[in-house]
Amino acid sequence: MAQISESVSPSTDLKSTESSITSNRHGNMWEDDRIQSLNSPYGAPAYQERSEKLIEEIKLLFLSDMDDSCNDSDRDLIKRLEIVDTVECLGIDRHFQPEIKLALDYVYRCWNERGIGEGSRDSLKKDLNATALGFRALRLHRYNVSSGVLENFRDDNGQFFCGSTVEEEGAEAYNKHVRCMLSLSRASNILFPGEKVMEEAKAFTTNYLKKVLAGREATHVDESLLGEVKYALEFPWHCSVQRWEARSFIEIFGQIDSELKSNLSKKMLELAKLDFNILQCTHQKELQIISRWFADSSIASLNFYRKCYVEFYFWMAAAISEPEFSGSRVAFTKIAILMTMLDDLYDTHGTLDQLKIFTEGVRRWDVSLVEGLPDFMKIAFEFWLKTSNELIAEAVKAQGQDMAAYIRKNAWERYLEAYLQDAEWIATGHVPTFDEYLNNGTPNTGMCVLNLIPLLLMGEHLPIDILEQIFLPSRFHHLIELASRLVDDARDFQAEKDHGDLSCIECYLKDHPESTVEDALNHVNGLLGNCLLEMNWKFLKKQDSVPLSCKKYSFHVLARSIQFMYNQGDGFSISNKVIKDQVQKVLIVPVPI
C-alpha cells in the first residue's frame, strides 16, 4: 500500500482528488473490440454431435480395453491407469466419471502394499512406473493409499529404482527409465504433511529430470515424453490448472507418430481437441458478456485502477471450465474487478480519513455516508454497492435463503476492514510484527469475498453448517488465505516495497534484524510449502460433508490457480508476455483440428 497521509485537518477538503502516488501497474491489455469480435465456429451443433459420438465410442473402447477376464491381469491394471491418466491430462475426464471409478475400484482391489508389477502377489516383480501412476490416481480420487509403498523402490543407498525395467538396455530402456522417474515425480507432488519418502522422491526426481533435459541423452528421449518432462518441471501440480494442462498435453500427445497410436488414443485426442474448442467457445461468450457489462459500467471511465478483467476471467476459467458453472465464473470476474478497484483505491488514491469514511459506508451499506468524498470515490462506492447487491440477490435466489447479512459481514466488511488496518499502519509509519501482519494480511487477500459468492452459485445447496466447513471459520479457508498472502509477498515484495506497501518480508526482517532478504524468503517459502501440503490433506481426505464441486472450486481456483498465476512473477499487477500467451491459448486461439 502506498504512502497515505495520516489525517485530514478540519480545514482540508475531503473532496481533494490528489493521489499520493501514481500506479505503475498495467492497464487493460485487451481491447474490448477484439473481445467482442471473437466468433468461434465450435458452437455449431455438428461439433457437439461429433463430440457426443466420440464420447460413446470411447466409453465402449474404454471398457473393452479393461476387460476383467483379461489373462494378463497385471498388464490390465497398468492399461487402466494409463487410460485414466490420459483422459485426465487431456481434460476430458468429466465425460467418463463412471468408467474412471470402475477402473480405479478395480485397481484399488488389486492394490498391494508392495506396489503394482508383473507376476502374482506372492512373486511380484515390482514396477515403480505402474505403482507411482496408481498411487497418484488413487490418491487424487480420495482412495486411502499409503506413501510407504514407495519404500519398496529404494536401494541400500536410499536411491529410487524402477524395478522391472532396470535390467534392460538401449534407447527404449532409457525412455522407460525417464517415464518411470516422471511418474514418480508427478506422484510425489500429491504429498501430505509428514510424508518424508514423498519429499525425498520429489527432490530425487526433480534433480534427475533436470539432468535429463540438460544432458546429451535428451536426444534419445521421445519428443512427446520430453514435452511431458518439461511440463512437469515448469508446472508442478500446485502450479498447474486444468485448461492450460489440457492445451499443453493436446500439443504434446499430438507429437506422437499416428501409426504408433491405438484406435482409442486417436479418438481420445480427437475428442480432446473438439472438447477444448467447444468449451473455449462457451468461455468466449461469457467473456463477451463481461466485456459489455464493464464497458457500460460507471467505472469504465475511471483511470485510477488496473483494468484486467480478461486475466481475472482466465484465473477462474482455466481452473473450473465446465459449462454448468458459467454463473460462478461471471460472478467471480465481477468480484475480482471490484476488488482491484478497491485495492487500488485504498492503495493509492485515498487519505486515511477518506478511507475511514469509505469503510464505514461499507460497514453500514449506506451510500449517503460517502457524500462528502471525491467524485471518483463516490462513483466507485455506488458501483460497488450496486454490483454487490446484484450478486447477493443472485446468491440468495440460488440458495433459497436470505444470506445478505452473512455475505456482507463475512466477505466485504472483513476484507475492507483489513485494508483499512493496513492503511493505518502505513499512515503512522508502523511496521507490524510478522505475526501481526499475517493476521491482518490473510483477510485482505480478498479470498473471503472470492470464496463465498461464487461458491453459493455452484448449484449446490449450502446451509451455514456446511458452508462453515469450507468457508469461515474453517482451517481450509484459512490455508487458502495464507497461501495467497505468502505467494503474493514472496513473488512481489520488491515491487510492493517500491510502491510503498508492506509485506511479510519487510516484517520478518524487522523481527529478525540479523537476517537477510534471502533468509526471509526461505522462511516464507517454507511456510508456503507447509501450507500447500496441509491443503492437499484437507482437499483430498474425506473429512466433511462439503459437496465435491465446491471443494474443487475453492482448491483449484483459490489455491492452485493463484500459484499458477504467480509461477513466473505477479500475473495480476503486471501481466507479462507469459500470462498473455497463456490467455491466448486458453481463451482466444482454438486448437488446430
Swiss-Prot record:
GO biological process: diterpenoid biosynthetic process
Presence of keyword Membrane: no
Cofactor: Mg(2+); K(+)
CDD domains: Terpene_cyclase_plant_C1
Binding site for Mg(2+) 1: 343, 347
SUPFAM superfamilies per record: Terpenoid cyclases/Protein prenyltransferases, Terpenoid synthases
Subcellular location: Cytoplasm
Positions with a binding annotation for Mg(2+) 3: 488, 496
Gene3D superfamilies in alphabetical order: Farnesyl Diphosphate Synthase, Terpene synthase, N-terminal domain
Motif position, DDXXD motif: 343-347
Pathway(s) annotated for this protein in UniProt: Terpene metabolism; oleoresin biosynthesis
Induction section of the entry: Constitutive expression.
Cofactor binding note from Swiss-Prot or TrEMBL: Binds 3 Mg(2+) ions per subunit.
Assigned keywords, A-Z: Cytoplasm, Lyase, Magnesium, Metal-binding
GO CC terms: cytoplasm
Keyword Magnesium: yes
Compositionally biased region (Polar residues): 1-26
Region (Disordered): 1-34
E.C. no: 4.2.3.56
Membrane-spanning residues: none
Domain notes: The Asp-Asp-Xaa-Xaa-Asp/Glu (DDXXD/E) motif is important for the catalytic activity, presumably through binding to Mg(2+).
Function comment: Involved in defensive oleoresin formation in conifers in response to insect attack or other injury. Involved in 52 sesquiterpene (C15) olefins biosynthesis.
Family named by the database record: Belongs to the terpene synthase family. Tpsd subfamily.
Additional facts recorded: In sesquiterpene synthases utilizing farnesyl diphosphate as substrate, magnesium is more efficient as cofactor than is manganese.
Protein name: Gamma-humulene synthase
Organism: Abies grandis (Grand fir)
Gene name linked to the record: ag5
